[in-house]
Amino acid sequence: MAMASALRRLSSSSNKPLQRLFNGGHLYSMSSLPSEAVYEKERPGVTWPKQLNAPLEVGDPEIADIIELEKARQWKGLELILSENFTSLSVMQAVGSVMTNKYSEGYPGARYYGGNEYIDMAETLCQKRALEAFRLDAAKWGVNVQPLSGSPANFHVYTALLKAHDRIMALDLPHGGHLSHGYQTDTKKISAVSIFFETMPYRLNESTGYIDYDQLEKSATLFRPKLIVAGASAYARLYDYARIRKVCDKQKAILLADMAHISGLVAAGVIPSPFDYADVVTTTTHKSLRGPRGAMIFFRKGVKEVNKQGKEVLYDYEDKINQAVFPGLQGGPHNHTITGLAVALKQATTAEYKAYQEQVMSNCAKFAETLVKSGYELVSGGTENHLVLVNLKNKGIDGSRVEKVLEAVHIAANKNTVPGDVSAMVPGGIRMGTPALTSRGFVEEDFAKVAYLFDLAVKLAVKIKGEAQGTKLKDFVAAMQSSAFQSEISKLRHDVEEYAKQFPTIGFEKETMKYKN
């Protein structure tokens, strides 16, 4: 008690004016810290509070500098990676708050630690807002907001609702699926999901680029899955949830919709919702939803059906899923993330958010249209959401080489497999999305410009490939270092940066940046 009293006196002993932290931003302010002499007078040797209250640029200038470099990268570059976005200042304030200090194993009202009354308030509010954001009836749906990320969230569901070696069907990874849905090759189980469960992929019709639902149904009849995943990481078309629901009903299988990439679009109501058909829905929270880096699991509750005896049969997902998350696979939740997620979910119910997601869709349509006019092939021929998957094979180049040039000119995108690829190491495509740049204020005409800059980068990659002294990626990278190509890279990078720098930064003020030039 004596030390606590002394520390309280120390915290109130200075009458100096407030100082801004984090390079003059408006995130936090605090009283200037008392001098060493005050510490020695009040409690000799107790100097660590000064270290704990020091701003980042004082306490760790090396890390502070790395953050400043990342700010500059985000400002000067074109962020086209589908799974990224720029979260809001208020979300970052919540994530960087004192909520990170508390440990809270368990659930609201049933914790294994004391002092969680405000943590309970934040988590309960987050759950309420999650249901509201997706227009769900709390009597029919519940939600767990504790999963740390999307892949663990999916594994929580498998663990909760399946037995070891039960069967799962999901979209094949090279056809746009995700690792966490149980990807394996003929010789190796890549995802841990395929170790603990038996998995079979369904695929696209390679001639159309759309999911082959007829073949999916035939495969399900033979494989008899216990769970079918409707979700993708690189599929530019809408899912036919009703069709998969019929397949699930026929097989008495659970329908898990993984909407990690599209949840922001679903929340805004600009694409169809999986909640009308799915039993369980998972999502990450930092992609199109534009929150912090976390995940959620939604599950049906209440009456499932009336049996032959006339008795109501209830869904039993809630307890199973909650127990799989904790104590099954996780310990204490990340309370700062849950608090930040609550903020993001409130934003997701606003008119501004709906307008943003509508612009995401419009931008992607324009992006796709411009790319096609420039001679690019898109998997499925176009887009119905926020992404384009470019098949580069008709350009005589692969995604790995194009990605290297894009990165050199400060365009962030990622190589991606496309149907027909024989090697994931040399994928034939590039995956790009519109959410992040739309957050910065890009509209249709800007994405026409982005498509033009992308085209210049691809043409440069083709030239470099033609001059490379070998067929390996390292030979291509070596060829990039020639003075002639470095000059072209430098010019294109300058054009990219000058265009990107016209737009607002998100979460920090341009004026406070250390590296503006």
UniProtKB/Swiss-Prot annotation:
GO cellular component: mitochondrion
Pfam family, one: SHMT
Biological process terms in GO annotation: glycine biosynthetic process from serine; tetrahydrofolate interconversion
Keywords carried by this UniProt record: Mitochondrion, One-carbon metabolism, Pyridoxal phosphate, Transferase, Transit peptide
Enzyme class name: transferase
GO molecular function terms listed in the Swiss-Prot or TrEMBL record: glycine hydroxymethyltransferase activity; pyridoxal phosphate binding
EC number: 2.1.2.1
Principal subcellular localisation of the protein: mitochondrion
Catalytic activity field: (6R)-5,10-methylene-5,6,7,8-tetrahydrofolate + glycine + H2O = (6S)-5,6,7,8-tetrahydrofolate + L-serine
Subcellular location: Mitochondrion
SUPFAM superfamilies listed in its UniProt record: PLP-dependent transferases (SSF53383)
Domain of life: Eukaryota
Transit peptide: 1-31
Pathways involved: One-carbon metabolism; tetrahydrofolate interconversion
Residues recorded as bearing N6-(pyridoxal phosphate)lysine in the entry: K287
InterPro entries hit by this protein: PyrdxlP-dep_Trfase (IPR015424), PyrdxlP-dep_Trfase_major (IPR015421), PyrdxlP-dep_Trfase_small (IPR015422), Ser_HO-MeTrfase (IPR001085), Ser_HO-MeTrfase-like (IPR049943), Ser_HO-MeTrfase_PLP_BS (IPR019798), SHMT-like_dom (IPR039429)
The keyword Transit peptide is assigned to this record: yes
Cofactor: pyridoxal 5'-phosphate
Job description of the protein: Catalyzes the interconversion of serine and glycine.
NCBIfam families: PRK00011.1
Stated family: Belongs to the SHMT family.
Subunit architecture: Homotetramer.
Protein's recorded name: Serine hydroxymethyltransferase 2, mitochondrial
